[in-house]
């Protein structure tokens, strides 16, 4: 049986010391680019695999980042997580996914304990991080950011799309199309992002001189039977346009309308993941630049790891309508 290639084997083949090979493998700046490339090329040809466990024991780092989310069926999360994971992998980090099985859309102490027990280096949360969870994490001093939802306490760095502007843009679009009674199928009122979208929607109606009818705003989960009931309810209220808090909901609304041969209702969504859904017909959707959000949020998190500080930032990214 062929013996496993060691660091010393690579060093001998390269004509350098094991110390130099180790420095090259860890991308240290005191090793020239040419030497690094030569060592990495020969190591690859020899089938050398770096012992990350040994490296992590020396550095105290697991080279692992936790990503916490609460909706594995939504292509929006899958797409963004894939982009973040790709960036982290390129920078030498692996990813462990944590799912909110309680479906309460918050990172509480129960879930935080589960995350911290795995010895991750840092945390990316797609759900709201509670004050008690932040307090628990402060003991461990793990860098943490919140993505997709703003924080009311302003004590955690957040990277979000401009949900308020999104609500305004989509409502203006429907008004310009001639719609007057616009319903809004929204998620739970506990989600700040969804509240911000409603605020944007209301602000445009008010500016346009349209009386805000609270009965046209529905808060629910993504259960399809609830969406069906909400759609019929808005039809009974003579709505000629329906805004949905995400594209999955918009797809369910369109499905119900088409099954009932209704084609004169404008339906809009958020997130622009239409290409990932079996939709019966295209519909307008609010979108943001996921590539930029993924790159900047991950870069900030890794900077926190390398140069710890108490700096808190709230980055809000512009959105636009995709028709």
Region locations from a protein language model:
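Short, solvent-exposed amphipathic alpha-helices that sit
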Residues: 38, 76-90, 166-169, 192-211, ...
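Short beta-strand elements in bilobed, periplasmic/extracellular small-molecule ligand-binding domains
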Residues: 88-100, 202-225, 321
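Short beta-strand segments enriched in small/hydrophobic residues
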Residues: 20-23, 57-73, 173, 182-188
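N-terminal helix-turn-helix DNA-binding module of bacterial transcription factors
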Residues: 1-61
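Flexible loop/turn connectors
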Residues: 230-241, 245-323
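Hydrophobic alpha-helical segments within soluble ligand-binding/sensing domains
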Residues: 157-184, 199, 203, 223-232, ...
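Alpha-helical recognition/docking segments in bacterial nutrient-uptake
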Residues: 2, 6, 60-172, 232-237
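An alpha-beta-alpha
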Residues: 168-210, 309-323
